Curated annotation (Swiss-Prot):
The gene is aroC. It comes from the Archaea. One of its GO terms (molecular function) is FMN binding. Residues 41-51 have a biased composition (Basic and acidic residues). It comes from Methanosarcina mazei (strain ATCC BAA-159 / DSM 3647 / Goe1 / Go1 / JCM 11833 / OCM 88) (Methanosarcina frisia). Keywords: Amino-acid biosynthesis, Aromatic amino acid biosynthesis, FAD, Flavoprotein, FMN, Lyase, NADP. This is Chorismate synthase. Residues 41-62 are annotated as: Disordered. This reaction introduces a second double bond into the aromatic ring system. It is an enzyme of class 4 (lyase). InterPro entries: Chorismate_synth, Chorismate_synth_AroC_sf, Chorismate_synthase_CS. The keyword Lyase applies. SUPFAM superfamilies: Chorismate synthase, AroC. PANTHER family: CHORISMATE SYNTHASE.
Amino acid sequence: MAGNVFGQMFRITTWGESHGRAVGVVVDGLPAGLPFSEADIQKELDRRRPGQSEVSTPRSEADSVEILSGIFEGKSTGTPISMLVWNSDARSSSYDAIKNTPRPGHADFTYIARYGIRDHRGGGRSSARETIGRVAGGALAKLLLSHYGIRIVGHVLELGGIRAKSLSFEEILENVERTPVRCADPEAAKKMLEKVSALRQEGDSAGGIVEVMVKGVPAGLGEPVFDRLDADLAKALMSIPAVKGFEIGAGFEAARMRGSEMNDSFLMEDGKVTCSSNNAGGILGGISSGLDIVCRVAVKPTPSISKLQQTVDLTTRENAEIAIKGRHDPTIPPRMVPVAEAMVALVFADHMLRSGFINPRTLLG
């Protein structure tokens, strides 16, 4: 199975399955000299872990990270960093009844079509538990970027058809962790929570939109034509399980605008080139303009629902019905926020190294 490596100069390789012994990541390309600890990684993993609120799966995992290599006396050595998280609360027997009946909306059928075999326990490699490795690697990318004044924040912009009001980067940063749905607008967050609770009672689920903003990005990041910054962001975010759409800046709204409305006029401010608006989302021609990066992903409803659905029995080759049991999130966006932030951080760490803004060997001077 290929496709487990992401990045060029700052690379991660994730490994493990939902109900295997452990999941983890190997990070390669982090320059020597970056101070970090398990606590820095754990802080991000705690935001992603299950069982943290009423809008997440009740699966109880501590998701405690162990750093196995690449660190000495509290600093990166420039060698590969391997991190591991043990799986401790897997209940594989819950999935035995659906071993031969692919779940609608899941990768069950397509994994069989591709490989001829699949780990049916919790989705195996296709489970969102794989994103633990992404978040751990992204935590290091965030730390690296913070040394260069680059900050990243994500939030739930929309959930179950309820949309938050427009907020600034600082407002989102200050308020996003104050609600279980990770929406920085308190009024919208309350309605979102009520909607998800009602859907959960019905045995159904809700989708939504996660927005990620990046502040402090220098102008000049990106490698046209095929490694455009926005193209790499799209690939990174579209690789997250359950993501079905991506947009940057005005996004699909740009299709309904005039050129005079869409174009961001240039102007001088404190001796620097800036723009009067940011419909381009901070990227022009695949290269960062120095404005904030603003991108969004559409997240589908959790496909694991207890409502009766139609499927097939791959053993008898007949039509069948399925009602999925087990412990599942009633909505995905709140726990996707740290995953989306991590993938964006990985893209920017990679491009900062590729574009020469960061010394690829050492931060020690």
